[in-house]
């Protein structure tokens, strides 16, 4: 047998010298011990023994690394090649009915959930490849943000054509709401950017129109929102104020002569910041601003404002900037918005809680400003809840991946000739995963 040594620096292969070749048949020698000279500063380290015996020992050690495993069979050699098999194909059938457990965990609208999963399986936008069965392929997080954003919009277009969003804003009642939440959960376990983008459009923009507006707003915008004929975003957060909504600095001044509100960004900290959908796609937004009438500040109110035309060109006197690449959710186009004397009709004020009459008179069914502010924000709670619920979807997916992997991956063997042990048979994995699985 000719032994070959690869020399990386030269990029060539050379035959081992006779010393290395002869060492292949030698047993591994006892490791060489050296004198501890650290404790004696004046003592010099011993020189390497130049005799052939020392060289042979060194050569033997290197040769054993190069020679590979000995001829004697080992547990790893006698085993077939390691390969992956889904747990359901190798484990015994469960002692319970999986369909009944699924019904218990999902709770409601099982057929609607299955219909949506089927619609996603049929589209290469969601299921572009098959690998041992139907496989959902998650978004490519190595793709640039523009590519991820385009993928999100293509998926939304496909789901719109399939009628997934039908009734999400125009139908009312517990049945319609539960069906919508079931479908959102199905989407949430697949693509987080898609879920956030839909959440901004339906649960923030759409819910503001539905729950803060009145019939004139519903008739004008709800159906177009549901059909994605218009794309909405939600401009509440500012660079200087996020959670403290009462402190926002954008100003909407009522002009009684033209019966319009004039919206302005008075300073840099008043720019609308981190607004999902604003950077690329949104045509309209809900602007939260301090309402000024005849020099009096009536507090924060919401105004429907168009920011782009139908070909997605930004309108005059509106400046929009991209928040750029993020550590996650790059399929969502977060942006920044500045307003410079943007005029919107009086009718664009969402007036369920308070209104402004044509002559500039401010009217409200709630006299106390604190109660009025609370009533103004309460319909928006659902959007906040949905963001928290997304963490539950992600936890479900993470736990499923971890358990399936632990039932497939093996590491180390208890006996010399036995199979390697499943990860889930290790107590450390059991303590981490099984309590979470039991609480699912």
Q: What is each residue range found by the language model?
A:
Residues 256-319:
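A short core secondary-structure module
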Residues 315-341:
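Flexible, small-/acidic-enriched active-site or ligand-binding loops
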Residues 39, 47-220, 224-232, 242-243, ...:
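Amphipathic, small/basic residue-rich leader segments at the start of a protein or domain
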Residues 258-264, 308-312, 338-352, 356, ...:
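Long, well-ordered alpha-helical segments
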Residues 152, 175-176, 197, 279, ...:
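Secondary-structure capping and boundary motifs in well-ordered enzyme cores
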Residues 230-236, 318-321:
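Short Pro/Gly-enriched beta-strand edge/turn motifs at strand-loop
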Residues 2-46:
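Low-complexity proline/serine/threonine-rich segments in eukaryotic and viral proteins
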Residues 186-190, 202-206, 268-272, 318-322, ...:
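Glycine- and acidic
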């Amino acid at each position: 047998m000719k032994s070959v040594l690869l020399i990386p620096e030269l990029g060539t292969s050379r035959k081992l010298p006779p010393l290395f070749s002869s060492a292949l048949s030698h047993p591994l020698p006892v490791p060489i011990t050296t004198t501890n000279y650290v404790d004696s500063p004046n003592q010099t380290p011993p020189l390497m023994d130049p005799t052939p015996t020392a060289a042979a020992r060194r050569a033997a050690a290197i040769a054993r690394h190069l020679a590979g495993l000995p001829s004697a069979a080992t547990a790893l050699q006698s085993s077939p090649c390691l390969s992956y098999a889904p747990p359901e194909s190798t484990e015994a059938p469960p002692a319970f009915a999986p369909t009944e457990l699924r019904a218990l965990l999902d709770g409601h609208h099982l057929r609607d959930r299955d219909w949506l999963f089927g619609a996603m399986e049929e589209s290469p936008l969601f299921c572009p490849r098959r690998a041992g069965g139907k496989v959902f392929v998650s978004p490519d997080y190595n793709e640039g943000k523009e590519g991820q954003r385009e993928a999100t919009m293509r998926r939304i277009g496909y789901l719109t054509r399939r009628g997934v969003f039908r009734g999400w804003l125009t139908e009312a009642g517990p049945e319609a709401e539960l069906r919508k939440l079931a479908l959102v959960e199905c989407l949430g376990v697949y693509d987080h950017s898609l879920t956030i983008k839909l959440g901004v459009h339906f649960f923030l923009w759409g819910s503001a129109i539905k729950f803060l507006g009145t019939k004139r707003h519903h008739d004008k915008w709800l159906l177009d929102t549901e059909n994605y004929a218009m794309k909405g975003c939600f401009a509440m957060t500012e660079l200087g104020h996020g959670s403290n909504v009462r402190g926002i600095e954008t100003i909407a001044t009522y002009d009684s002569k033209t019966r319009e509100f004039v919206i302005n960004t008075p300073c840099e900290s008043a720019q609308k910041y981190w607004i999902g959908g604003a950077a690329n796609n949104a045509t309209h937004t809900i602007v939260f601003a301090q309402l000024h009438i005849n020099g009096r500040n009536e507090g924060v109110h919401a105004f429907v404002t168009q920011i782009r035309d139908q070909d997605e060109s930004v309108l005059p006197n509106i400046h929009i900037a991209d928040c750029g690449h993020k550590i996650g959710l790059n399929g969502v186009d977060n942006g920044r918005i500045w307003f410079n004397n943007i005029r919107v009709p009086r009718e664009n004020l969402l007036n369920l809680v308070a209104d402004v009459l044509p002559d500039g008179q401010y009217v409200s069914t709630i006299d106390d400003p604190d109660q009025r502010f609370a009533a103004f924000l309460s319909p928006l709670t659902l959007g906040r809840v949905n963001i928290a619920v997304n963490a539950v979807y992600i936890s479900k997916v993470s736990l499923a991946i971890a358990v399936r992997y632990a039932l497939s991956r093996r590491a180390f063997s208890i006996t010399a000739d036995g199979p390697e042990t499943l990860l889930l048979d290790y107590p450390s994995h059991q303590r981490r995963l099984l309590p979470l699985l039991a609480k699912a």
